[in-house]
Amino acid sequence: MGQTIKEIKATLAKLTDLSAKEFLEYEADERAGVQAALKSRKKQILAELAEEARLEQMLEFEKELYGQEIQLIAGIDEVGRGPLAGPVVTAAVILPKNCKIRGLNDSKKVPKSKHHAILSEIQEKALAIGIGIVDAEKIDEVNIYEATKIAMIQAVSKLSVKPEHLLIDAMVLDFPIAQTKIIHGDARSASIAAASIVAKVTRDEMMKEFALEFPEYDFEHNAGYGTAKHLEALTKYGITRIHRKSYEPIKTMVNFKS
């Protein structure tokens, strides 16, 4: 007696190689349910192979360093350079050698619904995580570029394990550790992508807390960016202590002198 469709689906779920003999056998089965199951599983395997290839590509910079006997590599990224309110947040993450986390990417390319699950896996697997935070007052004092560098150095300094090399998204730090500046690094390096997720979730949670203190500004949804609702609240209620006075339109509103 032949297999039921349920049994075939169970067998297909275990297959990871498109050249497996079972695929050829089941292709001869004319039942619509079997053909649908075949098509679905093949699509899943192709997606899994594509994801594996993408994650392998994201280890390119790390593998180059592994080849030089460098193991402790910290990826560094920032979130929050553009908003009108709130801090700039950075993270430094050291992942174990050849670490692959499904779905890991630049936080801007990862659906928000998946941020916390990926963060949990990063926290579970990472050898060390450091977070740096610089508030609006300091941003106004030194400018956002310098504030970001300060926050990045904070993040590295808070790592419980000292890194041998830094992979940084589009920055160079005045710091006594060898480093590589990578343009669009959050989409090209697993270590930087991990830092991107950590920084993003950390900052989003901070902005939700600020939303409780300043409910008029919709910070829980706009994260401090200049949305229509945020700008309307600025006009109606003025600025808060977490607004950046060196950013327009706030700069003009308060006549801030940089």
UniProtKB/Swiss-Prot annotation:
Domain of life: Bacteria
Domain RNase H type-2: 71-258
SUPFAM superfamilies, sorted: Ribonuclease H-like
Subcellular localization(s) per the UniProt record: Cytoplasm
GO-annotated biological processes: DNA replication, removal of RNA primer; mismatch repair
Listed GO CC annotations: cytoplasm; ribonuclease H2 complex
Cofactor comment text: Manganese or magnesium. Binds 1 divalent metal ion per monomer in the absence of substrate. May bind a second metal ion after substrate binding.
InterPro entries given in the database record: RNase_HII, RNase_HII/HIII, RNase_HII/HIII_dom, RNaseH-like_sf, RNaseH_sf
Cofactor(s), names only, from the UniProt record: Mn(2+); Mg(2+)
Main location: cytoplasm
Swiss-Prot/TrEMBL catalytic activity: Endonucleolytic cleavage to 5'-phosphomonoester
Positions with a binding annotation for a divalent metal cation: 77-78, 169
One Pfam family this sequence matches: RNase_HII
Cysteine disulfide partners in this protein: none
Entry EC number(s): 3.1.26.4
Alphabetic keyword roster: Cytoplasm, Endonuclease, Hydrolase, Manganese, Metal-binding, Nuclease
GO function term, MF aspect, one: RNA-DNA hybrid ribonuclease activity
Function: Endonuclease that specifically degrades the RNA of RNA-DNA hybrids.
Protein family per UniProt: Belongs to the RNase HII family.
PANTHER family xrefs: RIBONUCLEASE H2 SUBUNIT A, RIBONUCLEASE HII
Protein name listed in UniProt: Ribonuclease HII
Protein encoded by which gene: rnhB
